[in-house]
Amino acid sequence: MADDVSEFLGQNPETAAWLELVHGECESDKLWRYRKEFILRNLSDVCGEAEVPPPPETNHKALDRLLAYSMVWANHVFTGCRYPLPVMEKVLKMAENIKVTDAPTHTTRDELVAKVKKRGISSSNEGVEEEPCKKQKSSDHGERESSYIEDTISDGNVPSTSLNKREARLSAAQRTDVNTEFYDKSSNRRSLPVSNAKSRLNLPEEAGYKHGATQGRKSHSDIRHQTSMKGPAQSSDNALKPTRRFTTEHTKERQPFFNRLYKTVAWKLVSAGGFNANLNHEELLNTCIESLKATLEVSFVPLTDLADLPQNKTSQENTVCELRCKSVYLGMGCGKTMETAKAVASREAVKLFLKKKVVVRICKRKFNGRDVEDLVLVDEEFRPVNLPPAIKNPQEIV
């Protein structure tokens, strides 16, 4: 057909000159070749068989409509755009004799969701340079996978009541100048002698906790006991602070935004050819959020400083990344570098948008050994168990 078009334009130089006026500046040669054929096949319905089309600036309504239909058809064939059914039927009928041999294939959002649902979502770290940590299998209820830690939380967490009892034992040990026993979060105990009442205990850091020791006593009535917990560990005073409770109002005011974000990410995935390991999930997620005038909130912390982790799963070189938007938790990831951790977290967040629907819910998460409420983006079939521990106190973020 390309030869027929060239022959026709050679015989009609005025029509050829007019076509160059409607040739888009950024239009590729391949797209223009087929759109030009579309215009020529339907030009006689607008201008007659032998008439030369009027210049584009004359605002000829029928001609403008033809040019618009040509762009609709080209966008549908080469970029996968969809339009209302009457428009699609019209342009497909106008192009029924045009054979496009090298058009790309496109996957609709519904086809993509159906395909992913059929084969299931793998929780492996494919596409990331290193595999962060071992993971447990996903449950049958569609529970969100965590790519950097095991879902189960260590039984060695020290609750606030245990901290109070420990302080009492330490204080009593000072009065009697006997050995003091120190308990870390993994329930390993070690005896530390208190040889001098004015000396200061230097306790090593384990599993992200640094315990400062008591300072000396001057007299029986002037005993002072100070315990400092640095990094992510909480003090006994913080444990006694009242817990803020989220309400349905917090979820309702954020849900409309994530409904729009769901549609934006879904169409972005369709245009990118679907969810795959080679996709830049970080860029995709950030672009979609910024298009809705929002910001992707990124937090990093060394894995060893994150509370509620089994001690044998920590690594000195690993970094944890947590993603939020509108103060709502999206996902977590772990890697040897910040870039890798963010890439893993972004991929886990994008997986959410492959589901039929995403909702903002109030879920329980661990923070410094205690349960706190957090706003979490999940799919509608999610069961709120085994969520990874929080990097920051969720109730101080909102």
UniProtKB/Swiss-Prot annotation:
| Record-annotated disulphide pairs | none
The alphabetized UniProt keywords are: Nucleus
Q: Which GO terms describe its cellular component?
A: nucleolus; nucleoplasm
Localization? Nucleus, Nucleoplasm
Q: What is an example of a Pfam family matching this protein?
A: XTBD
Return the Basic and acidic residues bias intervals. 131-147
- Major place of localization? nucleus
Coiled coil segments of this chain: none
Matching PANTHER family:
CDKN2A-INTERACTING PROTEIN, NF-KAPPA-B-REPRESSING FACTOR-RELATED
As for family, the record states: Belongs to the CARF family.
Name by which UniProt lists this protein: Protein CDKN2AIP homolog A
The organism's taxonomy opens as: Eukaryota, Metazoa, Chordata, Craniata, Vertebrata
